[in-house]
């Protein structure tokens, strides 16, 4: 789909998120393309991207720059293949490289501890780790040509693209803002219909990841946005309204958690199961529901509204009376 000089390309993803949208920006003289995110490392995704580029009168050789919104598999997976075969400059936040430098076994150990101590059944944790380990080991984060920081402008391109660091869903998450057209590419930071999850690795690294996410959402209210293009679901025409909806959603969820804890002590996994119920039936959705619940509980604990109690290696949460 094309809007002005922007193309949204839907690429298949071989797990529960189903798809990702990557974005192509045509240069004013139609000589080159900027790619925002690139899709998962699958033949289906690569062929779909290549065919789309050819259908609009370009070739993969016209790709000049790829900006990665964040280091989650469906957003960066094709980087290595593109980098090896085409002269594309790769840009990303330095935190993406920081994650790549962490010992992989340490990450697995931290994830295991996080979910076990928050009440998730061991069989579910093991199943997820097997899936996660396969994806990450087979698709390492490649070398980045240029790191970009909050407030930077992408160099050597005709578009005036400003980089906005927007942590929360991921520590390295970026939004990209075109000052001239007032278009923003929001990655997984602002999505229509669903609320972005607080990323798993960021849950481990941050004491209050939900608060960080809320603060970076608030920052986007300072930008005049005509339309935003997320990595999933539809473009958002009323981005400020959507941001406020997401902020209200998280406040409502915190109140729901507190009400759930009125008369009993529960684990994060138990609370997440009550919130999401049967719609979170797959292992991927179980992980998402648990991580989001942990993020809320960390925020509530920081605000002095809940306590955690460690019993037999598992954290139980109770409401502060």
Predicted regions and their residues:
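C-terminal regulatory/interaction regions
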Residues: 256-321
């Amino acid at each position: 789909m094309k809007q002005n000089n922007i193309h949204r390309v839907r690429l298949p993803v071989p797990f529960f998120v189903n798809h990702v949208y990557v974005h192509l920006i045509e240069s004013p003289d139609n000589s080159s393309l900027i790619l925002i995110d690139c899709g998962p490392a699958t033949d289906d995704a690569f062929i779909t991207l290549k065919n789309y580029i050819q259908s609009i009168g370009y070739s993969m050789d016209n790709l000049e720059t790829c900006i990665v919104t964040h280091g989650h598999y469906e957003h960066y997976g094709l980087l290595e293949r593109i980098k090896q075969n085409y002269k594309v400059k790769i840009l990303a936040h330095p935190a993406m490289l920081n994650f790549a430098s962490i010992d992989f076994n340490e990450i697995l150990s931290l994830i295991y501890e996080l979910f076990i101590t928050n009440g998730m059944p061991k069989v579910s944790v093991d199943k997820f780790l097997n899936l996660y380990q396969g994806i990450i080991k087979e698709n390492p984060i490649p070398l980045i040509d240029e790191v970009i920081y909050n407030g930077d402008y992408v160099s050597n391109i005709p578009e005036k693209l400003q980089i906005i660091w927007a942590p929360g869903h991921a520590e390295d998450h970026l939004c990209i803002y075109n000052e001239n057209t007032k278009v923003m590419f929001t990655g997984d930071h602002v999505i229509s219909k669903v609320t972005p999850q607080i990323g798993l690795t960021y849950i481990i690294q941050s004491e209050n990841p939900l608060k960080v996410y809320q603060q970076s959402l608030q920052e986007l209210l300072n930008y005049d946005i005509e339309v935003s293009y997320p990595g999933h679901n539809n473009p958002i025409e009323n981005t400020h309204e959507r941001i406020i909806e997401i902020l209200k959603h998280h406040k409502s969820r915190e109140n729901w958690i507190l009400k759930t804890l009125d008369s009993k002590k529960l684990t994060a996994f138990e609370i997440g199961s009550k919130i999401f119920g049967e719609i979170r039936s797959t292992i991927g959705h179980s992980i998402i529901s648990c991580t989001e619940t942990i993020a809320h509980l960390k925020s509530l604990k920081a605000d002095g509204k809940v306590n955690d109690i460690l019993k037999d290696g598992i954290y139980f949460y109770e409401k502060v009376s």
